[in-house]
Amino acid sequence: VSMADKFIVESELASFKNESFECEMDSKKLRETAQEGGFFSYVAGVASYVIDHYRVKGLRIHIDEMDLPIKSGLSSSAAICVLVARAFNEMYELQLNTMGEMNIAFYGEQRTPSRCGRLDQACAFGVMPVNMTFDGNEVFVDKIKVKKPLYWVFSELNGSKDTVKILSDLNKCYPFAETEIEKNVQKALGIENEKLIAKATKAIESGDAEQVGSLMVEAQNMFDSMVAPASPKELAAPQLHKVL
């Protein structure tokens, strides 16, 4: 990362398909790119938010390594947003802590069509388990201390999903639930989720892998029965259930 007069993101990695992004440090132009969607919408959204709130010039960001697959439900969009927020923070000495970087990343991504929630920004803490609590617009983060190692397996299902459609369908359930499906979504993602997370936090802290696995099965069953009906086409997940 280096300072520049413009905002530039470049890479020789295959995921970039020999494309790079370059734009003047103009909030309007960057917002337009963000709103259009596309590969560089996330970095443009964050840069536009930074310009609107801080006295900064441009950056040249060269990405030479990427080990997180995109469009796989692993928060790749949040990761690139956090990267841009942290780059501005460190290069221009904005004196932001991790939560500050997360806020910039979140509001920057909100300027794109994806409009993902705050949970993904937890990647800002790196390889560290955290418990995130949401209360209205407030977010509280507590680090989880693990007594013994837990080993995780991540599998690439080679599937596809439309995140924008999923979020659009789920957002219809809020703020007022009118149908039984909408009530189930609010219950599952509200009080029932809170109970599961409390149990999971204790299991992770104690290093109880078997209990963690059992709770993951319970969470998946609840999701399938109470949340998936709100977006049946996108959340059917046939490949996932075949593997499970």
What does each of the following model-derived ranges do?
Residues 47-48, 52-72:
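Glycine- and acidic-rich phosphate- and metal-coordinating loops
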Residues 73-97:
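DPxDG-like acidic metal-binding loop motif
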Residues 73-76, 116-118, 127, 165-168:
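Short acidic, glycine/serine/threonine-rich loops at helix termini
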